[in-house]
């Protein structure tokens, strides 16, 4: 004898089980679906999968990198002198500032010199002298974990404060915008015309004190023939010439060395 529908419903309520109703498609109703907690950490992956986070993360990191790059001011290059005094025929310079590539040094007497513009900070370098790597023992050195010894140099901004101040002063002094490029007054383009009287003008008269030169004086009998009288100071550093006699021209010049006077005579045949 079968149970009625009312009896089956009472038995199901007592057992605490309720059969969900299904629609024509075979799925449960929307009201019977499990609820998802939006703030639950277990459910975070449902809304933020790796496929969605990867592009956003890369875009954020790229934006942050650009922001940091803009905030950092580029280090100013400073002229730095490298000098090798250990002799040699061919000397090269290599360092961390040029990926350890060889840079030839210029010979300056007994030394080899190079001037490079390096950014501020710490730099390591080494010399390549006649086919052998070496360092300068007179300069600061640093030893790596592999035992390699390199020279080290610190390029500091404070070492160039004097040069920066001089540069600022020179820039201020070079501002000549308020000055005129030419003297004031009228200008014209007429060519200069020499006058006939200026073309045939006689040379100026010789000053009288230049007439008393040593070549025109006779040496006294009481004087030493190897010594000449002391000349006047206005006669120094001038070139004098005697009248041509017997086909010979005599030139003379007097110079002073400390307390002595030296007169040179040049005899030239004509």
Curated annotation (Swiss-Prot):
The biological processes this protein is annotated with in GO are: cellular response to nutrient levels; fatty acid biosynthetic process; nail development; positive regulation of cold-induced thermogenesis
Composition bias of kind Basic and acidic residues appears in 9-36
Lipid moiety-binding residues (N-myristoyl glycine): 2
Annotated GO MF terms: AMP-activated protein kinase activity; protein kinase binding
- Stretch list, region Disordered: 1-44
Post-translational modification Phosphoserine, affected residues: 5-6, 24-25, 40, 96, 101, 108, 182
- Coiled-coil stretches are none
N6-succinyllysine is found on 201
Supply the alphabetized keyword list. Fatty acid biosynthesis, Fatty acid metabolism, Lipid biosynthesis, Lipid metabolism, Lipoprotein, Myristate, Phosphoprotein
Q: Where in this protein does the record put region Glycogen-binding domain? A: 68-163
Cited function: Non-catalytic subunit of AMP-activated protein kinase (AMPK), an energy sensor protein kinase that plays a key role in regulating cellular energy metabolism. In response to reduction of intracellular ATP levels, AMPK activates energy-producing pathways and inhibits energy-consuming processes: inhibits protein, carbohydrate and lipid biosynthesis, as well as cell growth and proliferation. AMPK acts via direct phosphorylation of metabolic enzymes, and by longer-term effects via phosphorylation of transcription regulators.
Name this polypeptide is given: 5'-AMP-activated protein kinase subunit beta-1
State the species of origin: Mus musculus (Mouse)
